[in-house]
UniProtKB/Swiss-Prot annotation:
Keywords: Cell membrane, Glycoprotein, Ion transport, Membrane, Sodium, Sodium transport, Transmembrane, Transmembrane helix, Transport. GO terms for cellular component: plasma membrane. Belongs to the sodium:solute symporter (SSF) (TC 2.A.21) family. It is found in: Cell membrane. Changing residue 457 to Q: Confers sugar transport activity not found in the wild-type protein. Increased sensitivity to inhibitor phlorizin. Expressed in skeletal muscle, where it may localize to the neuromuscular junction (at protein level). Expressed in small intestine where it may localize to cholinergic neurons of the submucosal plexus and myenteric plexus (at protein level). Detected in kidney (at protein level). This is Probable glucose sensor protein SLC5A4. Residues 582-591 have a biased composition (Acidic residues). GO terms for biological process: sodium ion transport. The lineage of its organism: Eukaryota, Metazoa, Chordata, Craniata, Vertebrata. The chain crosses the membrane at residues 29-47, 65-85, 106-126, 172-191, 209-229, 271-291, 315-334, 424-443, 456-476, 527-547, 638-658. Does not function as sodium/D-glucose symporter. However, may function as a D-glucose sensor by generating a D-glucose-induced depolarization which is pH-independent, Na(+)-dependent at neutral pH and probably H(+)-dependent at acidic pH. Residues 1-28, 86-105, 192-208, 292-314, 444-455, 548-637 are cytoplasmic. Glycans are attached at residue 248.
């Protein structure tokens, strides 16, 4: 039976004194304080500079964002502290193959910018569930996807980031875990609720710069310490822990020696930890779900000035996604060389002694190197990098979750809600999500496993493929209708939940004690399972759609690929119902506004609730046209297309080099 650690054991395990004392000096603390002050200053500047008093201003930054902050925000929204912990940890455990999750994303970003975003913008939507409502009609798809997306935010996105951030906080600051997380989430929630998407994007840009600078510095220290790249490749394959026996266990050499294919990304289709067919066929499916249908990501692309800026932002982020191999994966592998007994520990009692967890300490590879290698001041900078990655991801999740709740759920409960009420509801929901996140921390703490990145990717493989299948068919197959899409999602969700719940119930097992989960359910690698789930959902969707009535083209103009350039007027499927609701709501009357005191005016300014001048009918039409415009300047179109081709060539080359 596998050794386990109860929550109380984790809480009572003392942190190693040398690590917890590392940040207790004036230089490091000063850098961290300066970081927080600068981030808050940028957030406040964005809060005062941008228009947050309208739905479009708060949730889409008024569609006035340039390509470079959008690209930085896309990168920062994706790269959280769980990447520094998860990618480095899996790199330490098994080598470079884990970077394929990042490199696949570079290709998906091009598909996002060239195929999916033009459809989303032409449809005039703010959220992904809203797109499904326009494309298929009805409300059950919109509500279902909104609730599922919020569920994924809590159990996957937020939980992974908080868990990874908690590792740094515990090691570096020695603070109480819950106090530190509460402070981080509180700061994050404040400038998300007050600043809107523009504030999030500008702070993401700052934090991307901090992340890249700090990560490059640590990479330099790491390669210098290990003696260069050639020395690194030689020493890694010999990095085995000194203690490989104990706890009355018979431990196989494969559990503690580096893999023979550590420096290759394409591994055996059956025995590989990341099999090569899964990389080619399964990984793009989960990447498609995350990058092309995920509210957190797509919302950033919907705020671009024009399509050229959107495409340039996607290219910028795609290039940045090539860096984690050198900034995270290889430093994690170097950490195994430098701190072998801790990072590569295999005997449960030894692992508990080093990091308080019996399943392994690979998740501590990057944090340990930060605290051991970096000099004073730079240690504070690197902790700021970790905090930056954590907070940038959380702000993105909070803002997008707020958008989902407000646009897709709250408007169903309060059909006559004013714009001001919707803005307030969105902000309050962020605060509620903060509370839920804190409550979730104990569950994350006791469910930690040896490799965080495999946890996040497996959950994505169980929940994401049905969503990806429906969006692909919605855009490329106009014959698909609401009944097919709904039941395709339902069947896919049932299949995914059966696999996920069964795996949680039996456990994923470890090298020391394999899981007892039935092979028919858990015996298939999660990347292979994502392929089955994707095409299974697609077949159900197509089959039911072909057996039921098609949607007339008049309802599909600019909502699917073959009709994307149509200039015909589109009639929404629920147009009659919508018209009746507007009639029932009545016309909003203009009442003379009462004089407001200084404190109330300051409150409105801080929360973005101040009213701007009322738009004329012509101005409203111009704004609506701007929000659905996909035009490009010819010169910019040529530049971004050339860069896209160049990027694809680079991605193919690096895959071949490390194959």
């Amino acid at each position: 039976m596998a050794s386990t650690v109860s929550p109380s054991t984790i809480a009572e395990t003392p942190e190693p004194p040398p690590l917890s004392d590392h940040i207790r000096n004036a230089a490091d603390i000063s850098v961290i304080v300066i970081y927080f002050l600068v981030v808050m200053a940028v957030g406040l500047w964005a809060m005062l500079k941008t228009n947050r008093g309208t739905i479009g201003g708060f949730f889409l930054a008024g569609r006035d964002m340039a390509w470079w902050p959008m690209g930085a925000s896309l990168f920062a929204s994706n790269i959280g502290s769980n990447h520094y912990v998860g990618l480095a940890g899996t790199g330490a455990a098994s080598g470079v193959a884990t970077v394929t999750f990042e490199w696949t994303s570079s290709v998906m970003l091009l598909i996002l910018g060239w195929i999916f975003v033009p459809i989303y913008i032409k449809s005039g939507v703010m959220t992904m569930p809203e797109y499904l409502k326009k494309r298929f009609g009805g409300e059950r798809l919109q509500v279902y996807l909104s609730i599922l997306s919020l569920f994924i935010c809590v159990v996957l996105l937020i939980s992974a980031d908080i868990f990874a951030g908690a590792i740094f906080i515990k090691l570096a600051l020695g603070l109480d875990l819950y106090l530190a997380i509460f402070i981080l989430l509180a700061m994050t929630a404040v400038y998300t609720t007050t600043g809107g998407l523009a504030s999030v994007i500008y702070t993401d840009t700052l934090q991307t710069i901090i992340m890249l600078i700090g990560s490059f510095i640590l990479m330099g220290f790491a390669f210098n310490e290990v003696g260069g790249y050639e020395s690194f490749t030689e020493k890694y394959v010999n990095a085995t822990p000194s203690v490989v026996e104990g706890d009355n266990l018979t431990i196989s050499a494969s559990c503690y020696t580096p893999r023979a294919d550590s420096f290759h990304i394409f591994r055996d289709a059956v025995t590989g930890d990341i099999p090569w067919p899964g990389i080619i066929f399964g990984m793009p499916i989960t990447a498609l779900w995350y990058w092309c249908t995920n509210q957190v990501i797509v919302q950033r692309c919907l705020c671009g000035k024009d399509m050229s800026h959107v495409k340039a932002a996607c290219i910028m982020c795609a290039y940045l996604k090539l860096l984690p191999m050198f900034l995270m994966v290889m430093p994690g592998m170097i950490s195994r060389i430098l701190y072998t007994d801790m990072v590569a520990c295999v005997v449960p009692s030894e692992c508990v002694k080093h990091c308080g967890v019996d399943v392994g300490c690979t998740n501590y590879a990057y944090p340990t190197m930060v605290l051991e290698l970096m000099p004073q001041g730079l240690r504070g900078l690197m902790l700021s990098v970790m905090l930056a990655s954590l907070m940038s991801s959380l702000t993105s999740i909070f803002n997008s979750a707020s958008t989902l709740f407000t646009i897709d759920l709250y408007t169903k409960m309060r059909k006559q809600a004013s714009e001001k009420e919707l803005l307030i509801a969105g902000r309050i929901f962020v605060l509620l999500l903060t509370v839920v996140s804190i409550v979730w921390v104990p569950l994350v703490q006791v469910s930690q496993n040896g490799q965080l990145i495999h946890y996040t990717e497996s959950i994505s493989s169980y929940l994401g493929p049905p969503i990806a299948a429906v969006f692909v068919l919605a855009i490329f197959c106009k014959r698909v209708n609401e009944q097919g899409a709904f039941w395709g999602l339902m069947v896919g969700l049932a299949m995914g939940l059966i696999r996920m719940i069964t795996e949680f119930a039996y456990g994923t097992g470890s090298c020391l004690a394999p899981s007892n989960c039935p092979k028919i359910i858990c015996g298939v690698h999660y990347l292979y399972f994502s392929i089955v789930l994707f095409f299974g959902s697609m077949l159900v969707t197509l089959g039911i759609s072909l057996l039921t009535k098609p949607i007339p083209d008049v309802h599909l103009y600019r909502l699917c690929w073959v009709l994307r350039n149509s200039t015909e007027e589109r009639i929404d499927i629920d147009a009659e119902e919508k018209s009746q609701e507007e009639t029932d709501d009545g016309v909003e009357e203009d009442y003379p506004e009462k004089s407001r005191g200084c404190l109330k005016k300051a409150y409105d300014l801080f929360c973005g609730l101040q009213k701007g001048p009322k738009l004329t009918k012509e101005e409203e039409e111009a704004l609506s046209k701007k929000l659905t415009d996909t035009s490009e300047r010819p010169s910019w179109r040529t530049i971004v297309n050339i860069n896209a081709i160049l990027l694809l060539a680079v991605v193919v080359f690096i895959h071949g080099y490390y194959a």
